[in-house]
Amino acid sequence: ARPCGACAKQWPLVIFSHGSGAFRASYLYWTEFLASHGFVVMACDHAGSARYTQLDGAVVKPGGKRSKREQMEADRPKDMTFLIDCMEALATKGGDSRFAGRVDTSRVALTGMSFGGFATAAALEAKDPRVKAAVMKCPSISMSGTGALATDRTDKTTPVMVMLGSEDTV
């Protein structure tokens, strides 16, 4: 999206987390849609998640000996919070960033697809006061059996929309 020039208002921030085996550009239809409706969107590229990642040349099979699922479950929500922190630094009024004074980091939404939906739920567990809403599209569950989507939800107050397909068996 084009820079907003001398905007009088600040734009809310959306942090997007992709699904397993994907990367940030895999969901351009969603992130561009959000950006075209007045949101500043930051999309994660989570380490070790894309099918095309080759760090040491080894083959990693889901759930296999070299699977990093548990580590990714711990890291992905932290990646999302890290992006909020980064934008907060970039958006500081008076700074020299193109985002200075243009992004309202007190109005953040988290969104994600599949494993990114799990990351969104897990990031909500931190109860970051900057996060005002979340959208989880076909969220996966924790394979380690702990954390997001595995705890009592009665004390949660952040509005969340969960989108699922009735035929989704994953």
Give the residues covered by each predicted segment.
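Active-site machinery of serine-nucleophile hydrolases
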Residues: 25-63, 70-73, 77
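The feature captures the conserved acid-bearing segment of alpha/beta-hydrolase catalytic domains
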Residues: 4-6, 132-170
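Conserved alpha/beta-hydrolase "nucleophile elbow" surrounding the catalytic nucleophile
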Residues: 18, 112-114
